Protein backbone atom coordinates (compact mmCIF):
# COMPACT_ATOMS: atom_id res chain seq x y z
CA UNK A 1 0.00 0.00 0.00
CA UNK A 2 1.40 3.40 -0.96
CA UNK A 3 1.16 6.47 1.24
CA UNK A 4 1.29 10.08 0.08
CA UNK A 5 3.41 12.70 1.78
CA UNK A 6 0.20 14.13 3.19
CA UNK A 7 -0.73 10.75 4.75
CA UNK A 8 2.72 10.46 6.29
CA UNK A 9 2.59 13.96 7.69
CA UNK A 10 -0.91 13.45 9.10
CA UNK A 11 0.30 10.30 10.85
CA UNK A 12 3.35 12.15 12.16
CA UNK A 13 1.16 14.99 13.40
CA UNK A 14 -1.09 12.60 15.34
CA UNK A 15 1.98 10.89 16.75
CA UNK A 16 3.34 14.23 17.90
CA UNK A 17 0.10 14.98 19.69
CA UNK A 18 0.44 11.71 21.59
CA UNK A 19 4.11 12.38 22.34
CA UNK A 20 3.29 15.89 23.48
CA UNK A 21 0.64 14.58 25.86
CA UNK A 22 3.02 11.96 27.23
CA UNK A 23 5.76 14.55 27.63
CA UNK A 24 3.60 16.85 29.72
CA UNK A 25 2.09 14.03 31.72
CA UNK A 26 5.56 12.89 32.63
CA UNK A 27 7.16 16.27 33.06
CA UNK A 28 4.54 18.42 34.70
CA UNK A 29 2.04 16.21 36.50
CA UNK A 30 2.10 13.25 38.81
CA UNK A 31 1.93 9.72 37.42
CA UNK A 32 1.12 6.29 38.81
CA UNK A 33 4.55 4.80 38.36
CA UNK A 34 7.15 5.85 40.91
CA UNK A 35 10.53 6.86 39.57
CA UNK A 36 13.27 4.97 41.33
CA UNK A 37 14.82 7.17 44.01
CA UNK A 38 18.17 5.56 44.57
CA UNK A 39 21.61 6.79 45.53
CA UNK A 40 24.22 6.00 42.90
CA UNK A 41 27.96 6.14 43.18
CA UNK A 42 28.53 6.08 39.43
CA UNK A 43 26.57 6.31 36.22
CA UNK A 44 25.27 3.13 34.53
CA UNK A 45 27.97 3.53 31.88
CA UNK A 46 30.72 4.49 34.24
CA UNK A 47 32.29 1.04 34.32
CA UNK A 48 33.46 1.63 30.76
CA UNK A 49 34.17 5.34 31.06
CA UNK A 50 37.37 6.61 32.60
CA UNK A 51 35.94 10.06 33.17
CA UNK A 52 33.05 8.97 35.39
CA UNK A 53 32.68 10.79 38.67
CA UNK A 54 32.65 7.72 40.90
CA UNK A 55 33.45 9.75 43.98
CA UNK A 56 30.29 11.85 43.68
CA UNK A 57 27.05 10.50 45.12
CA UNK A 58 24.01 11.69 43.14
CA UNK A 59 20.37 10.85 43.09
CA UNK A 60 18.94 9.51 39.86
CA UNK A 61 16.23 11.52 38.07
CA UNK A 62 14.67 11.40 34.59
CA UNK A 63 15.48 13.43 31.50
CA UNK A 64 12.85 13.85 28.76
CA UNK A 65 13.91 15.17 25.36
CA UNK A 66 11.69 17.87 23.89
CA UNK A 67 13.49 18.07 20.52
CA UNK A 68 12.48 15.68 17.74
CA UNK A 69 14.42 16.74 14.64
CA UNK A 70 18.01 15.80 15.53
CA UNK A 71 20.58 15.13 12.79
CA UNK A 72 24.30 15.38 12.12
CA UNK A 73 25.60 18.93 12.29
CA UNK A 74 24.66 21.79 14.62
CA UNK A 75 21.64 21.17 16.84
CA UNK A 76 19.64 23.02 19.46
CA UNK A 77 18.64 20.23 21.86
CA UNK A 78 16.05 20.88 24.56
CA UNK A 79 14.95 18.68 27.44
CA UNK A 80 13.07 18.62 30.74
CA UNK A 81 14.10 17.08 34.05
CA UNK A 82 11.72 15.10 36.30
CA UNK A 83 12.57 14.65 39.98
CA UNK A 84 11.89 11.53 42.06
CA UNK A 85 8.53 12.92 43.24
CA UNK A 86 7.37 13.37 39.60
CA UNK A 87 7.79 17.15 39.78
CA UNK A 88 9.81 19.19 37.26
CA UNK A 89 13.30 20.04 38.45
CA UNK A 90 14.25 23.64 37.69
CA UNK A 91 17.71 25.11 38.25
CA UNK A 92 19.52 27.84 36.35
CA UNK A 93 21.82 25.48 34.44
CA UNK A 94 23.16 21.93 34.31
CA UNK A 95 26.24 20.23 32.88
CA UNK A 96 25.77 17.98 29.87
CA UNK A 97 27.90 15.48 28.02
CA UNK A 98 27.18 13.35 24.99
CA UNK A 99 28.35 9.85 24.11
CA UNK A 100 28.10 7.96 20.82
CA UNK A 101 26.71 4.59 21.90
CA UNK A 102 27.36 2.75 18.60
CA UNK A 103 31.13 3.17 18.90
CA UNK A 104 33.43 0.28 19.76
CA UNK A 105 34.80 2.40 22.59
CA UNK A 106 32.19 4.51 24.34
CA UNK A 107 33.50 7.81 25.61
CA UNK A 108 32.41 11.40 26.09
CA UNK A 109 32.66 13.23 22.77
CA UNK A 110 30.94 16.52 23.58
CA UNK A 111 30.69 18.44 26.84
CA UNK A 112 28.63 21.53 27.49
CA UNK A 113 26.06 23.37 29.56
CA UNK A 114 22.29 23.68 29.28
CA UNK A 115 20.43 26.70 30.63
CA UNK A 116 16.85 26.66 31.85
CA UNK A 117 14.34 28.70 29.83
CA UNK A 118 10.98 29.49 31.39
CA UNK A 119 7.96 29.30 29.12
CA UNK A 120 5.76 32.42 29.15
CA UNK A 121 2.34 30.87 29.74
CA UNK A 122 2.94 28.60 32.73
CA UNK A 123 5.53 27.37 35.22
CA UNK A 124 6.78 24.96 32.57
CA UNK A 125 10.07 25.27 30.73
CA UNK A 126 12.99 23.38 29.21
CA UNK A 127 16.77 23.29 29.32
CA UNK A 128 18.48 24.45 26.13
CA UNK A 129 21.82 23.08 24.95
CA UNK A 130 23.86 23.39 21.77
CA UNK A 131 25.60 20.34 20.35
CA UNK A 132 27.26 19.33 17.09
CA UNK A 133 26.78 15.66 16.15
CA UNK A 134 29.27 14.29 13.63
CA UNK A 135 27.88 10.76 13.28
CA UNK A 136 24.34 9.38 12.89
CA UNK A 137 23.18 6.63 15.21
CA UNK A 138 22.39 6.15 18.88
CA UNK A 139 23.66 8.82 21.27
CA UNK A 140 23.31 9.35 25.00
CA UNK A 141 22.95 12.59 26.91
CA UNK A 142 24.08 12.66 30.55
CA UNK A 143 22.97 15.53 32.74
CA UNK A 144 24.54 16.51 36.04
CA UNK A 145 23.62 19.35 38.36
CA UNK A 146 22.93 20.63 41.85
CA UNK A 147 19.39 21.30 43.01
CA UNK A 148 18.21 24.29 45.00
CA UNK A 149 18.92 22.41 48.26
CA UNK A 150 22.53 21.79 47.29
CA UNK A 151 22.09 18.10 46.43
CA UNK A 152 23.72 16.51 43.36
CA UNK A 153 21.51 14.86 40.76
CA UNK A 154 22.12 12.83 37.61
CA UNK A 155 20.05 11.84 34.58
CA UNK A 156 20.62 10.13 31.24
CA UNK A 157 18.73 8.94 28.19
CA UNK A 158 19.46 7.62 24.72
CA UNK A 159 18.18 9.09 21.48
CA UNK A 160 18.61 8.78 17.72
CA UNK A 161 20.55 11.19 15.52
CA UNK A 162 19.57 11.02 11.84
CA UNK A 163 21.88 11.41 8.86
CA UNK A 164 19.47 14.02 7.48
CA UNK A 165 17.01 16.24 9.31
CA UNK A 166 13.32 16.47 8.42
CA UNK A 167 13.65 20.25 8.11
CA UNK A 168 16.23 22.02 5.92
CA UNK A 169 19.81 21.54 7.11
CA UNK A 170 21.95 24.43 8.31
CA UNK A 171 23.68 26.14 5.35
CA UNK A 172 21.39 24.41 2.83
CA UNK A 173 18.98 26.14 0.45
CA UNK A 174 15.52 26.56 1.90
CA UNK A 175 12.35 25.89 -0.12
CA UNK A 176 11.27 28.93 -2.12
CA UNK A 177 7.73 28.62 -0.86
CA UNK A 178 4.86 30.74 -2.09
CA UNK A 179 2.76 30.90 1.04
CA UNK A 180 -0.42 32.94 1.02
CA UNK A 181 -0.03 36.62 1.82
CA UNK A 182 -2.44 39.24 3.11
CA UNK A 183 -2.95 40.40 -0.47
CA UNK A 184 -4.08 36.88 -1.46
CA UNK A 185 -6.98 36.58 1.00
CA UNK A 186 -10.15 38.47 1.81
CA UNK A 187 -9.57 38.40 5.57
CA UNK A 188 -6.50 37.94 7.78
CA UNK A 189 -8.32 35.16 9.67
CA UNK A 190 -7.76 32.91 6.65
CA UNK A 191 -3.99 32.86 7.23
CA UNK A 192 -3.60 33.70 10.93
CA UNK A 193 -5.19 32.27 14.08
CA UNK A 194 -3.60 34.98 16.25
CA UNK A 195 -6.09 36.93 18.33
CA UNK A 196 -4.36 40.21 17.44
CA UNK A 197 -2.31 39.51 14.30
CA UNK A 198 0.58 41.73 13.25
CA UNK A 199 -0.35 42.38 9.63
CA UNK A 200 3.25 43.04 8.66
CA UNK A 201 4.03 39.35 9.24
CA UNK A 202 1.84 38.49 6.24
CA UNK A 203 3.08 40.89 3.58
CA UNK A 204 5.66 38.59 1.98
CA UNK A 205 5.96 35.04 0.76
CA UNK A 206 9.17 33.17 1.49
CA UNK A 207 10.01 33.46 -2.23
CA UNK A 208 9.53 37.25 -2.03
CA UNK A 209 11.76 37.44 1.03
CA UNK A 210 14.58 35.39 -0.46
CA UNK A 211 14.65 37.68 -3.49
CA UNK A 212 14.80 41.04 -1.66
CA UNK A 213 18.38 40.77 -0.35
CA UNK A 214 17.52 40.80 3.35
CA UNK A 215 17.80 38.06 5.98
CA UNK A 216 14.47 36.44 6.83
CA UNK A 217 12.82 35.05 9.96
CA UNK A 218 10.02 32.53 9.39
CA UNK A 219 7.96 31.18 12.27
CA UNK A 220 5.64 28.20 11.75
CA UNK A 221 3.03 28.23 14.51
CA UNK A 222 -0.70 27.99 15.10
CA UNK A 223 -1.59 30.15 18.12
CA UNK A 224 -5.20 28.97 18.38
CA UNK A 225 -4.53 25.23 18.11
CA UNK A 226 -1.04 24.86 19.62
CA UNK A 227 -0.54 21.77 21.79
CA UNK A 228 1.95 23.46 24.14
CA UNK A 229 0.26 26.90 24.26
CA UNK A 230 3.60 28.48 23.30
CA UNK A 231 2.74 29.32 19.68
CA UNK A 232 0.92 32.55 20.49
CA UNK A 233 3.75 33.87 22.66
CA UNK A 234 6.28 32.78 20.02
CA UNK A 235 4.53 34.71 17.27
CA UNK A 236 4.28 37.70 19.62
CA UNK A 237 8.06 37.56 20.18
CA UNK A 238 8.67 37.46 16.43
CA UNK A 239 6.39 40.47 16.03
CA UNK A 240 8.32 42.34 18.71
CA UNK A 241 11.61 41.52 17.03
CA UNK A 242 10.18 42.72 13.73
CA UNK A 243 9.76 46.15 15.27
CA UNK A 244 13.34 46.13 16.56
CA UNK A 245 14.81 45.08 13.20
CA UNK A 246 12.48 47.12 10.98
CA UNK A 247 13.95 47.49 7.49
CA UNK A 248 16.85 45.11 8.21
CA UNK A 249 15.13 41.71 8.25
CA UNK A 250 12.01 40.12 6.72
CA UNK A 251 9.57 38.52 9.15
CA UNK A 252 6.92 35.96 8.17
CA UNK A 253 4.38 33.89 10.13
CA UNK A 254 2.91 30.75 8.56
CA UNK A 255 0.11 28.68 10.08
CA UNK A 256 0.46 24.91 10.50
CA UNK A 257 -3.01 24.24 9.09
CA UNK A 258 -4.36 25.56 5.80
CA UNK A 259 -8.03 25.54 6.85
CA UNK A 260 -7.97 27.24 10.24
CA UNK A 261 -11.49 28.65 9.82
CA UNK A 262 -12.95 25.19 9.19
CA UNK A 263 -11.54 23.40 12.25
CA UNK A 264 -14.20 24.74 14.63
CA UNK A 265 -12.78 23.01 17.70
CA UNK A 266 -12.32 19.64 16.01
CA UNK A 267 -8.62 19.13 15.26
CA UNK A 268 -9.51 16.07 13.17
CA UNK A 269 -10.77 18.49 10.53
CA UNK A 270 -7.39 20.19 10.31
CA UNK A 271 -5.45 19.93 7.06
CA UNK A 272 -1.68 20.31 7.20
CA UNK A 273 -0.45 23.20 5.08
CA UNK A 274 1.51 22.12 1.97
CA UNK A 275 4.15 24.69 3.00
CA UNK A 276 4.57 22.91 6.34
CA UNK A 277 5.08 19.60 4.56
CA UNK A 278 7.49 21.23 2.11
CA UNK A 279 9.64 22.36 5.05
CA UNK A 280 9.40 19.03 6.90
CA UNK A 281 7.99 20.59 10.06
CA UNK A 282 7.57 17.93 12.75
CA UNK A 283 6.58 20.04 15.77
CA UNK A 284 5.49 23.55 16.63
CA UNK A 285 6.38 26.29 17.01
CA UNK A 286 9.37 26.09 14.66
CA UNK A 287 11.42 29.18 13.75
CA UNK A 288 13.97 29.54 10.94
CA UNK A 289 16.47 32.29 10.19
CA UNK A 290 17.55 32.54 6.56
CA UNK A 291 20.60 34.33 5.16
CA UNK A 292 20.43 36.90 2.38
CA UNK A 293 21.49 34.25 -0.14
CA UNK A 294 18.62 31.90 0.73
CA UNK A 295 20.71 29.48 2.79
CA UNK A 296 19.54 28.50 6.27
CA UNK A 297 21.46 30.22 9.06
CA UNK A 298 19.80 28.64 12.12
CA UNK A 299 16.63 26.89 13.27
CA UNK A 300 14.77 26.61 16.55
CA UNK A 301 12.41 23.77 17.33
CA UNK A 302 9.96 24.62 20.10
CA UNK A 303 9.54 27.82 22.07
CA UNK A 304 12.55 30.13 21.82
CA UNK A 305 13.14 33.19 23.98
CA UNK A 306 13.37 36.71 22.61
CA UNK A 307 17.02 36.97 23.68
CA UNK A 308 18.00 33.77 21.89
CA UNK A 309 16.32 34.83 18.66
CA UNK A 310 17.68 38.37 18.95
CA UNK A 311 21.24 37.05 19.21
CA UNK A 312 20.75 34.79 16.17
CA UNK A 313 19.26 37.60 14.09
CA UNK A 314 22.10 39.89 15.10
CA UNK A 315 24.60 37.25 13.97
CA UNK A 316 22.99 36.77 10.57
CA UNK A 317 22.88 40.52 10.00
CA UNK A 318 26.58 40.71 10.77
CA UNK A 319 27.46 37.65 8.66
CA UNK A 320 28.33 35.45 11.64
CA UNK A 321 27.42 31.80 12.24
Language-model regions, residue ranges each:
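Typically the conserved alpha-helix immediately C-terminal to a functionally engaged Cys/Sec
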Residues: 228-245
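Bacterial signal peptide processing site
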Residues: 32-35
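Thioredoxin-like thiol-disulfide oxidoreductase module
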Residues: 256-284, 289-293, 314-315
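Short active-site neighborhood of thiol/selenol oxidoreductases, capturing the structured segment around
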Residues: 206-227
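C-terminal motif of bacterial Sec signal peptides marking the signal peptidase cleavage site
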Residues: 27-30
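Non-catalytic, surface beta->alpha helical segment in thiol-disulfide oxidoreductase systems
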Residues: 292-321
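N-terminal secretory signal peptides that target proteins for export/translocation
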Residues: 1-12
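Contiguous segments within soluble domain cores/interaction surfaces
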Residues: 37-188
